[in-house]
Amino acid sequence: MKTHDQSNSRLIYDTSMFMQHNMDAVYKQGLVSFDIELSYIRAYLGMQKRIHPGLEVLVEDKVTEFKVPYNTIEPLVENAVEAAVETKQDGKVVVRSYERLDCFAIQIVDNGNGVSPVKKFRAKQDFRGLQKQLKSSVGALIEVRTKPDKGTILTVKIPKQGYVIKE
């Protein structure tokens, strides 16, 4: 059982990590290891669990040794959390990374109302801009599957071969 002090310490740590990530996003460009991006995602999810106690979060990071453009995956996770907690007390978000023969994949799943992220994505972050950045820097494709009242599955596929990664 966590003590109140441990819980507060974790919240302070998560908040500082997330703030650092946001400040770095102003001037950082290029690629980072997914492991680094995932550390900011974990910090964000930790903060959200504190704000939304009913939020269930699962991170399955089977593979993290590939690169992504800085600050492109975390905004997608933010959108999934917003969708999950918007209409449900018991929202759920799953973030997975795994490897296929031809690509690395990052999957973000929410149990929100199933509205397409393309239609709903926050005004401050342009979904199409993220798509373009992922495509131009690592050749990634984004697949979105959504079902009304069931949620959304967003998969980012980063090819292993046939694309030159621009750093």
Question: Model-found features: residue ranges?
Answer:
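Two-component histidine phosphotransfer core
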Residues: 1-128, 133-143
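Short, charged, solvent-exposed linker or helix-capping segments at domain edges/interfaces
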Residues: 165-167
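C-terminal beta-strand of the catalytic ATP-binding
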Residues: 155-162
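Glycine-rich nucleotide-binding loop
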Residues: 114, 147-155
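A short coil/beta-turn micro-motif at the C-terminal edge
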Residues: 99, 148-150, 160
